[in-house]
Regions:
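Bacterial Sec-dependent N-terminal signal peptides
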Residues: 1-26, 539, 543
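A broad, structure-centric signal for solvent-exposed, well-ordered loop/edge residues
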Residues: 7-8, 13-16, 50, 81, ...
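Outer-membrane beta-barrel porins/channels
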Residues: 21-35, 40, 109-543
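Outer-membrane beta-barrel translocator/receptor signature
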Residues: 38, 50-59, 65-142, 219-222
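A generic local structural motif
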Residues: 59-60, 296
């Protein structure tokens, strides 16, 4: 079964099935993070024009061409994290510590005669991204309800199509939105009169309500690289690499509301009336996948002290498998109801929803320049552009709600959302290294990444579509990394240490703003700030 939900400002164009991947899914699983060896991190990742580091295989494979000796090494990091969410009335903060194994690699060097002095090859494992984070908060005095949002976009759908009844399962009606089905069978939305295509939510004039949310995300992106490089006359260094991706992401979200003077369904008289209302919406999502990309790079050394670098990464062509599940629990107590059974409570859930999709991540282009000041110092500068608005999503071809054909076709609506929500990210990396003596080096770096989200989307000026029954989403602002490093060499052995402070802010939305364009309702949200203090340790041996 396939689902898509299409929104426009003030007008619902169409609502169909809930099991197509969304632009938000693509955004959640494609973060660009600065991760690598301790030397790489200590210099802010500014290695597009540098080399002789195992992290070159994930950035510019031409950097392998500068190796004179074979190298084997590994890296791990200790990450101390703080997640904070600030609403108008509350602030919530959580801490956690994680230890990760980030990198293992080997580079072999073959000496040649002729114009190409050396040929290098390398293999490596790299943890490119960690998607672990926690967002939790509490909004007092909400001005609307998730139920009102669902009622707003469900208007026009006959309630007989949403109701589970005997052998009829509304989830297998391809015209139904799964969140509408979940809400109607949980009495979150109701028909206020005899019109079966009109709906009301729980929030009415005079309702007082609060909202609570907790979203736990976990995941990673790993890349396995096979790279080849060469050195032509110690002036031109080329590199070509193949990256194999392994991706895993889970998202567990709870959203609760409690209200007094709400518009609730009185099951004794089968009519609506004022009362107390409470519900919890639980969602679980898992995305796993594999993919591949290609990388090509060049480093040119026109004079001894100057190096210029360029690298291009193709999209990563990903094959993804999705699983989603949603569940509600509810409790409504009408003011005028009598007897011990006056409370209407229960729960309702979706079936497990499994489907596959395709995702092409953006192209990546990077340029860099570095100055080598004698045997003592290096200063390096990089620029990278990642066009997130060019991501492409594909869904399985299907003939009807339970019959899939072969192959994949463009997910037209999700691809339109990608262009509406996202833009290109610009990344600037600056790094420096100073060699104190033959054994010790100190390093510093700065890494800045602009937000890849359009201002209209992050500010809540447009409706945001999500897949499945989880309406929540988060958009991040700019990301900054400040880095320091220390290196020690003894004969063929080396050990490097780096400290990385990352600060990322953003906005969490429990669900999208909705309503007519001139009267859009504000929904529960929080300003979020994530801070990471990472200690990165690398060790290796050159021979």
């Amino acid at each position: 079964m396939r689902t898509r939900t299409i929104f426009a400002l003030g007008l619902l164009a169409a609502v169909t099935s809930a099991s197509a991947q969304s632009a938000i899914d693509a955004y959640n699983i494609t973060p660009t993070q600065m991760r690598g060896t301790a030397r790489f991190v200590g210099m802010g990742g500014a290695f597009t024009s540098l080399g002789s580091d195992l992290s070159c295989m994930t950035q510019n494979p031409a950097g392998l061409g500068l190796y004179r000796h074979s190298d084997i090494g590994l890296t791990f990091d200790i990450s101390i994290r703080n997640y904070a969410a600030q609403t108008e009335t509350q602030k919530n903060s959580e801490n956690e510590t994680r230890v990760k194994f980030d990198n293992f690699g080997y580079v072999g060097v073959v000496n040649l005669s002729g114009a190409m002095n050396t040929f290098q090859w390398g293999v490596s494992y790299n943890r490119l991204a960690v998607m672990d984070r926690l967002t939790s908060g509490y909004n007092l005095g909400t001005s609307t309800s998730l139920s009102n949002y669902i009622a707003w976009y469900t208007n026009g759908v006959n309630s007989n199509d949403l109701l589970e009844d005997g052998d009829y399962d509304p989830y297998y009606n391809p015209d139904n939105d799964w969140l509408s089905v979940l809400a109607y069978n949980s009495f979150m939305i109701n028909n206020p009169g005899s019109n079966l295509e009109e709906y009301s939510g729980l929030h009415q004039r005079g309702t007082v309500g609060d909202a609570l949310y907790n979203v736990r995300e976990r995941g990673y992106t790993d890349e396995y690289n096979i790279d080849f490089a060469g050195n032509i006359s110690d002036m031109v260094f080329w590199g070509l690499g193949v990256g194999i991706y392994d991706l895993n992401y889970t998202r567990e979200a709870n959203y609760s509301e409690s209200m007094s003077n709400a518009l609730v369904y009185d099951h004794q008289i089968r009519a609506l009336g004022s009362g107390n209302a409470g519900f919890n919406l639980y969602n679980w999502q898992a995305i796993s996948g594999t993919g591949a990309n290609l990388k090509f790079g060049v480093i040119v050394r026109p004079v001894e002290m100057l190096r210029l670098g360029f690298a291009i990464h193709t999209p990563t062509w990903l094959h993804l498998s999705h699983t989603t599940y949603g569940e509600t629990s509810y409790n409504y107590t009408p003011d005028e109801a009598e007897g011990s059974d006056k409370t209407n409570s229960g729960d309702f859930s979706t079936p497990d929803n499994d489907y596959d999709s395709r995702l092409n991540t953006p192209w990546r282009f990077m340029v860099g320049a570095s100055v080598v000041i004698g045997p003592k110092a290096i200063i390096s500068l990089d620029y990278e552009r990642v066009a997130y608005n060019d991501m492409k999503l594909k869904r399985q071809r299907y003939y009807d709600y339970d019959s899939f054909g072969g192959g994949y076709v463009d997910n037209t609506y999700a691809n339109e959302d990608v262009k509406n929500y996202f833009r290109a990210a610009n990344i600037i990396r600056v790094g420096a290294e100073y060699r104190i003596n033959r054994n010790w080096s100190v390093r510093a770096g700065y890494n800045y990444q602009s937000s890849n989200v359009r201002k209209e989307a992050s500010d809540g000026a447009m409706h945001i579509s999500t897949a499945g029954t989880d309406p929540s989403y988060r958009f991040d602002n700019d990301t900054q990394n400040i880095c320091l490093g220390l290196g020690y060499r003894y004969k063929a052995w080396y050990i490097d240490l780096a400290y990385q402070h990352t600060r990322q802010t953003g906005t969490f939305h429990a669900y999208t703003p909705f309503g007519e364009s001139n009267s859009t309702l504000s929904t529960p949200q929080a300003k979020v700030t994530d801070k990471y203090n990472n200690i990165v340790i690398s060790t290796g041996f050159r021979f």
